[in-house]
């Protein structure tokens, strides 16, 4: 496996992304049918790796390490689209999800605690 930390974000993209003070940007991940699957965090290296490989790759704040979705679970994400919101401070990724997107194994992280 390549190391996501070795990937550099294209400067023309980097200047458009507003990373927070920790160097992270939230990524909303949705399926190709528009279902929201999860929210995760990316740094510039994770974003660069995702663009280069088309594999959903994130930065785990709790483990302080890169996380390529499906590397251990087999529940992979093939990225088919990636865009920034109007402020450049959120990434929207469209993926073909194989297996569950949630760490619990569920398809989405947003089906366990429905409030309304």
From Swiss-Prot:
It catalyses: 1-(5-phospho-beta-D-ribosyl)-5'-AMP + H2O = 1-(5-phospho-beta-D-ribosyl)-5-[(5-phospho-beta-D-ribosylamino)methylideneamino]imidazole-4-carboxamide. GO terms for biological process: L-histidine biosynthetic process. Binds 1 Mg(2+) ion per subunit. Binds 1 zinc ion per subunit. Mg(2+) binds at residues 85, 87, 89. The keyword RNA-binding does not apply. The keyword Electron transport does not apply. Zn(2+) binds at residues 86, 102, 109. Keywords: Amino-acid biosynthesis, Cytoplasm, Histidine biosynthesis, Hydrolase, Magnesium, Metal-binding, Zinc. Pathway: Amino-acid biosynthesis; L-histidine biosynthesis; L-histidine from 5-phospho-alpha-D-ribose 1-diphosphate: step 3/9. Its EC number is 3.5.4.19. Gene3D superfamilies: Phosphoribosyl-AMP cyclohydrolase (3.10.20.810). GO terms for cellular component: cytoplasm. It comes from the Bacteria. One of its GO terms (molecular function) is magnesium ion binding. It holds the Pfam family PRA-CH. It is found in: Cytoplasm. Its cofactor is Mg(2+); Zn(2+). PANTHER family: HISTIDINE BIOSYNTHESIS BIFUNCTIONAL PROTEIN, PHOSPHORIBOSYL-AMP CYCLOHYDROLASE. Catalyzes the hydrolysis of the adenine ring of phosphoribosyl-AMP. Homodimer. Belongs to the PRA-CH family. This is Phosphoribosyl-AMP cyclohydrolase. It comes from Corynebacterium diphtheriae (strain ATCC 700971 / NCTC 13129 / Biotype gravis). The gene is hisI.
């Amino acid at each position: 496996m390549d190391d996501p930390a070795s990937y550099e974000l294209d400067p023309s993209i980097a200047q458009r992304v507003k990373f927070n003070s920790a160097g992270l940007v939230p990524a909303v991940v949705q399926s190709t049918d528009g279902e929201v699957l999860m929210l995760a965090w990316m740094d510039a290296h994770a974003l660069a790796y995702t663009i280069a490989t088309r594999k959903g790759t994130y930065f785990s704040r709790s483990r302080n390490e890169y996380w390529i979705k499906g590397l251990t679970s087999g529940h992979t994400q093939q990225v088919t689209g990636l865009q920034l919101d109007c402020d450049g401070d959120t990434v929207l990724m469209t993926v073909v999800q194989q297996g569950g997107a949630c760490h619990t194994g569920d398809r989405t992280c947003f089906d366990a605690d429905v409030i309304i």
